[in-house]
Amino acid sequence: MAEEQVLNTHNASILLSAANKSHYPQDDLPEIALAGRSNVGKSSFINTILGRKNLARTSSKPGKTQLLNFFNIDDKLRFVDVPGYGYAKVSKSERAKWGKMIEEYLTSRDNLRAVVSLVDLRHAPSKEDIQMYDFLKYYDIPVIVVATKADKIPRGKWNKHESVVKKALNFDKSDTFIVFSSVERIGIDDSWDAILEQV
């Protein structure tokens, strides 16, 4: 996106939900996908960086997002919220269906510019987190790792937790790593800088 193009991030709305490519928006707007395990804070991330309270519905029940949700941002950019992975109470067949839907989008969508891969800063990445990061690297899809829930950890321990996450992911230094908290509104500007650099 050209520097002179100012993005009004508050001018955002949910556009549509899609189960497969026949339902995707048919235009050339750049898209940023958001991926992460259930309850990592994807909806809170979307709401926080867009300055909206309930645009993306947060849920106490993990596994709520079952479709690709496309958010229109100022008619210049879209966020695509993909179903949270790693939720045990969803059947194997349902998980396989979600996996196929996510893979189809990530590997075939020309509009896709980068993926924001959300992980929980408090814990070492899950097997699914590592698989997602490896998948994105394999397909050469630009990835921005956002480590959420930083407010749950004393600031003095952030570096230690960041090191644990990076080591587990075998983090590529050319990728961007952002410590984020929707509660304390930490990492918003860094997230936008990284996103706009890709579009």
Swiss-Prot record:
One of its GO terms (biological process) is division septum assembly. One of its GO terms (molecular function) is GTP binding. Residues 28-199 form the EngB-type G domain. One of its GO terms (cellular component) is cytosol. GTP binds at residues 36-43, 63-67, 81-84, 148-151, 180-182. Gene3D superfamilies: P-loop containing nucleotide triphosphate hydrolases. Mg(2+) binds at S43, T65. HAMAP family: GTPase_EngB (MF_00321). Belongs to the TRAFAC class TrmE-Era-EngA-EngB-Septin-like GTPase superfamily. EngB GTPase family. This is Probable GTP-binding protein EngB. The lineage of its organism: Bacteria, Bacillati, Bacillota, Bacilli, Lactobacillales. The gene is engB.
